[in-house]
Amino acid sequence: MPGLVDSNPAPPESQEKKPLKPCCACPETKKARDACIIEKGEEHCGHLIEAHKECMRALGFKI
């Protein structure tokens, strides 16, 4: 029927075939970190910067 949403989403093949790029990893912590740095300055966002680093390390990035 037209107008129905496909209930079978495409499998996440991109992560299986291509390695995750640092720019695409941890989008939640990256967004929070970047917003804090822009609004308050890097010196006030250490906890968010560290949280993003921990997330990146958990995904295998060496930071």
UniProtKB/Swiss-Prot annotation:
One of its GO terms (biological process) is positive regulation of cell population proliferation. Disulfide bonds join C26-C55, C36-C45. It holds the Pfam family COX17. Its main location: mitochondrion. One of its GO terms (cellular component) is cytoplasm. Acetylation by KAT8 promotes assembly of the mitochondrial respiratory chain complex IV (CIV). Residues 1-20 are annotated as: Disordered. Cu cation binds at C23, C24. A motif (Cx9C motif 2) lies at residues 45-55. The modification N6-acetyllysine is found at K18, K30. The modification Phosphoserine is found at S14. InterPro entries: Cys_alpha_HP_mot_SF, Cyt_c_oxidase_Cu-chaperone. Residues 23-63 form the CHCH domain. A motif (Cx9C motif 1) lies at residues 26-36. Gene3D superfamilies: CytochromE C oxidase copper chaperone. It is found in: Mitochondrion intermembrane space; Cytoplasm. Ubiquitous. Keywords: Acetylation, Chaperone, Copper, Cytoplasm, Disulfide bond, Metal-binding, Mitochondrion, Phosphoprotein. Copper metallochaperone essential for the assembly of the mitochondrial respiratory chain complex IV (CIV), also known as cytochrome c oxidase. Binds two copper ions and delivers them to the metallochaperone SCO1 which transports the copper ions to the Cu(A) site on the cytochrome c oxidase subunit II (MT-CO2/COX2). PANTHER family: CYTOCHROME C OXIDASE COPPER CHAPERONE (PTHR16719:SF0). Belongs to the COX17 family. Interacts with COA1. Interacts with the chaperone CHCHD4; this is important for correct folding and the formation of disulfide bonds that stabilize the structure. This is Cytochrome c oxidase copper chaperone. It comes from Homo sapiens (Human).
